[in-house]
């Protein structure tokens, strides 16, 4: 809806301000970013000059919409602040076998993954489990099973239940929820009442230093925490 678009824009703008502040210390940073519409709003609103920063996608590609892929968002973000960037060309949700052979044989991919693993700032969106599963063109009966197993939220191709349990994960190169404790600053960027459960599931599944959200989602999360 139009209201959702406004919320995404505002959240993206707020997250851009926070990121600019973090990068303003003049140090060299590696920033990993995920894909999605809210993250695209962040990239569109970033300002300042940070030539010593390197921006990388948190994971490989997802879906057909190139504008919303992490690679594209990393590029736009870097170009808007005079930073450098790397791209990761690994298809989303390949078999573990194919993924391992890509990582073993493609030194370019391996080099980018190594940089991603050194990120000291991560900015990521949060998806609703059913919506993200449809984006990944999962079979309807598989999506139903995910939901029956309790999946409500998704980040980094990992599907989480409301209690933070990990229900399912897709194979991909890059960051996973398990990597988050090693990263200096983790910023989640998501809002809207419809995403409240998803946000809480991902926070519980990993760790979050800063959550940029809106009042509707925040109220909803607060209510769930009181229950």
Set out the residue ranges of the language-model regions.
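HTH-adjacent hinge/linker in prokaryotic transcriptional regulators
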Residues: 1-32, 44-51, 65-67
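A short acidic, glycine/proline-enriched capping/turn motif at secondary-structure boundaries
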Residues: 3, 38-39, 62-63
């Amino acid at each position: 809806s139009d209201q959702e678009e406004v919320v995404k824009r505002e959240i993206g703008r707020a997250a851009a301000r926070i990121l600019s502040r973090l990068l303003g210390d003049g140090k060299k940073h590696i920033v990993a970013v995920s894909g999605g519409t809210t993250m695209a709003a962040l990239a569109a609103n970033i300002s300042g000059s940070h030539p010593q920063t390197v921006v990388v996608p948190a994971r490989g590609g997802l879906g057909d919409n190139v504008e919303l892929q992490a690679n594209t968002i990393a590029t736009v973000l870097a170009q808007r602040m005079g930073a450098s960037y790397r791209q990761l060309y690994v298809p989303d949700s390949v078999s573990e076998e194919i993924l391992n052979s890509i990582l073993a044989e493609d030194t370019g991919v391996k080099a980018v993954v190594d940089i991603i693993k050194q990120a000291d700032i991560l900015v990521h969106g949060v998806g609703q489990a059913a919506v993200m599963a449809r984006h990944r063109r999962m079979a309807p009966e598989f999506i139903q099973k995910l939901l029956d197993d309790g999946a409500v939220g998704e980040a980094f191709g990992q599907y989480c239940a409301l209690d933070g349990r990990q229900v399912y994960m897709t194979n991909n190169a890059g960051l996973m929820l398990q990597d988050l404790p090693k990263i200096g600053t983790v910023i989640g960027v998501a809002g809207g009442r419809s995403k409240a459960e998803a946000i809480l599931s991902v926070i519980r599944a990993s760790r979050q230093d800063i959550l940029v959200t809106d009042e509707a989602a925040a109220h909803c999360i607060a209510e769930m925490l009181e229950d």
